[in-house]
């Protein structure tokens, strides 16, 4: 069964009578009318009028559930279940005190299903797509083994480490992107505002301008005339590529492999993918999910099409009876150190421990690379800014220097 996509929030305005016979009214953010009726019923309010309205963009963004919210929920459930709090009570405690309406609605739906006798894993799968295949499969394993607190503890640790890794990767991508954008912005302002002023001054010289200055002036003319069209073309190309990626597996695969070849950033992306693969597989396998099922789930959550393809190949070869480390070697996607540790794990019967160690090593390497990214990129940034911005400045002052030498 596929996870149900979470319904959008709606704003319900209601009027009714409370247990004291007094007229009351209010509004409530919820994903369904049934949820509103259930909540008002719990408050002993008899509904007289209920009207559905739209939700503002600000409210929708404020109350939207993010991956981090699911991670925090998982940690809260792990803590409460470990201390002996029943699952229904734990769900109610988190739901009643959560500030996001969408999360309240999701937890209310799960709680209602569990109280009606539905297994927690099935209730989560039905309630929201935020609970992915890995999450639901692990919860189901915990239910079958009677060890739900430990499973939630594993899930919480796994998600926390995944969130930290994702934040590091985003940081690695943002820094160079911001530098390039700033350089382009400064160059655009110079070409459209500063250089035209210099050009007006040059017209009074009555002499031929240096070749380099002429080329920069031509570039300035082009940017002033066609920058809007260039921006539209670039935006169209980006949206077109996104559409192609969405509809074509081969395009997704090629762009993923291209991204892994970028200097420094590609290395971070590759190590992050290997760390996530190792951590996900270790978490699934340690929870009691068979290795083949774990591989299948891990492929779906890899976050990179190149590694997803490689993991699917590992799954097929392992299902055919090949040792996993050999199947991994055949994909040519994993470093030798990873293969050696997986081989030791398979032969010693401690595969989950070795995979966790691989994940720890690569998470540390990602942390180290991102933390030192400024030092690594600083020389490149200086050269880039010096070439782009400095080149424009030099081009503008060359005629002045030439004029001064003639006058001298």
From Swiss-Prot:
GO cellular component, one term: plasma membrane
Localization, UniProt: Cell inner membrane
Transmembrane annotation, as ranges: 178-198, 221-241, 381-401
Domain of life assignment: Bacteria
Classification via InterPro entries: GspF/PilC, T2SS_GspF/T4SS_PilC_CS, T2SS_GspF_dom, T2SS_GspF_sf
Coiled coil ranges: none
Protein topology in the membrane: Multi-pass membrane protein
Stored Pfam families: T2SSF
GO biological process: protein secretion by the type II secretion system
Keywords noted in UniProt: Cell inner membrane, Cell membrane, Fimbrium biogenesis, Membrane, Protein transport, Transmembrane, Transmembrane helix, Transport
Keyword Protein transport attached: yes
Family according to the record: Belongs to the GSP F family.
Entry function: Involved in the translocation of the type IV pilin.
Name the record gives this protein: Type IV pilin assembly protein PilC
